[in-house]
Amino acid sequence: MAKKITGYIKLQIPAGKANPSPPIGPALGQHGVNIMEFCKAFNAKTQADEGTITPVVITVYADRSFSFITKTPPVPVLIKKTIGIESGSSVPNKNKVGKLTKAQVEEIAKKKMPDLNAASVEAAMRTVEGTARSMGVDIVE
């Protein structure tokens, strides 16, 4: 028989850097999850992408055990990493902070495809382009 699920916890944690301090500790503690066990498992699974923000969905079961699924980094994180900027523009319609080529957009879209609800790579590219524009990044051919 399947285990009874008591809850889901969604967090965005830097890969390889999970520790029991807030926000991770309190979020897991209120569900009765062994915090250190999660931190060790998460860090082991994500050590290759050290430092990149990684969304994780933790499923908590009635017997206080857990399982988790890591997702691909958020699109803004991938865009910032690709063009090497610290943050997006505070006024994206006036100040542009960088440029992305169509090839770079396609690369980001393909990397993000499993987590997007886009039907095709072209649709995923439009999603990535929209995010880039809202960050003050120009799309060039």
From Swiss-Prot:
Pfam families for the chain: Ribosomal_L11, Ribosomal_L11_N
GO biological process terms on file: translation
Post-translational modification, as annotated: One or more lysine residues are methylated.
Keywords tagged on the record: Methylation, Ribonucleoprotein, Ribosomal protein, RNA-binding, rRNA-binding
InterPro entries cross-referenced by the UniProt entry: Ribosomal_uL11, Ribosomal_uL11_bac-typ, Ribosomal_uL11_C, Ribosomal_uL11_C_sf, Ribosomal_uL11_CS, Ribosomal_uL11_N, Ribosomal_uL11_N_sf
MF (Gene Ontology): large ribosomal subunit rRNA binding; structural constituent of ribosome
GO cellular component, one term: cytosolic large ribosomal subunit
CDD domains: Ribosomal_L11
Subunit architecture: Part of the ribosomal stalk of the 50S ribosomal subunit. Interacts with L10 and the large rRNA to form the base of the stalk. L10 forms an elongated spine to which L12 dimers bind in a sequential fashion forming a multimeric L10(L12)X complex.
UniProt family annotation: Belongs to the universal ribosomal protein uL11 family.
Function: Forms part of the ribosomal stalk which helps the ribosome interact with GTP-bound translation factors.
Protein name in UniProt: Large ribosomal subunit protein uL11
Source organism of the structure: Trichlorobacter lovleyi (strain ATCC BAA-1151 / DSM 17278 / SZ) (Geobacter lovleyi)
Gene that this polypeptide is encoded by: rplK
